[in-house]
From Swiss-Prot:
Ranges of residues in domain ATP-grasp: 9-244
Coiled coil: none
Cofactor: Mg(2+)
Subunit comment: Heterotetramer of two alpha and two beta subunits.
Full protein name: Succinate--CoA ligase [ADP-forming] subunit beta
GO function terms (MF aspect): ATP binding; magnesium ion binding; succinate-CoA ligase (ADP-forming) activity; succinate-CoA ligase (GDP-forming) activity
Disulfide linkage: none
Gene it is expressed from: sucC
InterPro entries: ATP-grasp, ATP-grasp_succ-CoA_synth-type, ATP_grasp_subdomain_1, Succ-CoA_synthase_bsu_CS, SUCC_ACL_C, Succ_CoA_ligase-like_bsu, Succinyl-CoA_synth-like
């Protein structure tokens, strides 16, 4: 789950991590009032959307008067911001962060992620702050330094200190930087983050180390124990189909193709998308109905798939282990009748009660194409949507 920059900074502030003073604003008047409260001669007006690259897209403005705050807030609120992370459709700006300006002396990068190769959290740092870290990794990987963290003892002060020296934090500010990194790590662990990224981390003219921007993403599987984090969820920033799917414990991710997929199990879902591509088709979604799908879940899955106007056909690929094929078949028949499906539908069933499942489909009287294998099903749906 993603949250906004101002929300991330609120969490960091609670952990003693240094961030600039700021206020969130939903209207132009609120933006002006926030700037008045801050009382800073320079304010930064920042568009709040769930995407990076806002500065390059014109979503970050420096205001030197209340009139400029009003002008920039008027420009940004309601604007559709297109960045390299939003896609061409962009995201509408519905809230702003009004933040006090600061005298930036030097920019750095600090980030925490889970490293799959070592199964450990890794603290990364670079003195190439303010730019895309992927770009730095590709062009000058030697400028990125890493500290792998032992989960039994957590981040140690000597590791944070070593990283601070490696990225050339001024010696007199190393202790501040160490405190910053230790606090950031505590947030990462306590809140079950998947990413904690500060880009840029800045050293200011008056000798402070602080987060000028902050990105926190959270492991969705751990949200049940973080009610406080769930309150930060902004449904306006999420795909409505994905939001609807989450209500029924369906794992749905929208894609750009025209073949809707309904599969049980993430691995099989990935393989299904691959084989559709192999035979010349384009999947419209990733949809994992899980191991305990009911007829109701299958019906809702169909509705979500069909809410995408690009879908021209559906491929259902089910391996019945825990889930029985006859239950899925009944769900497919019920869903097809409920939604009035008039698109090509190819179904491949295998596993527990497969013969009973096939019989239910055959006797339904509906226009359902049966497939003998995953490859057969993929070829059939690709042909049918052409």
């Amino acid at each position: 789950m993603n949250i906004h920059e101002y929300q991330a900074k609120e969490i960091l502030r609670n952990y003693g991590v240094s961030v600039p003073n700021g206020r969130v604003a939903f209207t132009v008047e609120e933006a002006v009032e926030a700037a008045k409260e801050l009382g800073s001669p320079v304010c930064v007006v920042k568009a709040q959307i769930h995407a990076g690259g806002r500065g390059k897209a014109g979503g970050v403005k420096v205001a030197k008067s209340l009139d400029e705050v009003r002008t920039y807030a008027s420009e940004l609120l309601g604007k559709v911001l297109v960045t390299h992370q939003t896609g061409p459709e962009g995201k509408e700006v519905k809230r702003l962060l009004i933040e006090e300006g600061c005298d930036i002396k030097k920019e750095y990068y600090i980030g925490l992620v889970v490293d799959r190769a070592t199964s450990r959290v890794v603290l990364m740092g670079s003195e190439e702050g303010g730019t895309e870290i992927e770009e730095v990794a590709a062009k000058t990987p030697e400028k990125i330094f890493k500290e792998y963290i032992d989960p039994a003892v957590g981040l140690q002060a000597f590791q944070a200190r070593r990283l601070a020296f490696n990225i050339n934090i001024p010696k007199e500010l190393v202790n501040q930087a160490v405190k910053f990194m230790m606090g950031l790590y505590q947030v990462f662990v306590d809140k079950d983050c998947s990413i904690a990224e500060i880009n840029p981390l800045v050293v200011t003219g008056d000798g402070k180390v602080m987060a000028l921007d902050a990105k926190l993403n959270f492991d969705s599987n751990a949200l049940y124990r973080h009610k406080d984090i769930l309150e930060y969820r902004d449904l306006d920033e999420e795909d409505p189909k994905e939001v609807e799917a989450s209500k029924y414990d369906l794992n749905y991710i929208a894609l750009d193709g025209n073949i809707g997929c309904m599969v049980n199990g993430a691995g099989l879902a990935m393989a299904t998308m691959d084989i559709i591509k192999y035979y010349g088709g384009e999947p419209a979604n990733f949809l994992d109905v899980g191991g305990g799908a009911t007829a109701e879940k299958v019906t809702e899955a169909f509705k979500i798939i069909l809410s995408d106007p690009n879908v021209k056909g559906i491929f259902v690929n089910i391996f019945g282990g825990i889930m029985k094929c006859d239950v899925i078949a009944s769900g497919i028949v019920e869903a097809t009748k409920q939604v009035g499906l008039n698109l090509p539908l190819v179904v491949r069933l295998e596993g527990t009660n497969v013969e009973l499942g096939k019989k239910i489909l055959q006797e339904s009287g509906l226009n359902i194409t049966a497939a003998d294998s995953m490859a057969d099903g993929a070829q059939k749906i690709v042909e049918l949507v052409r």
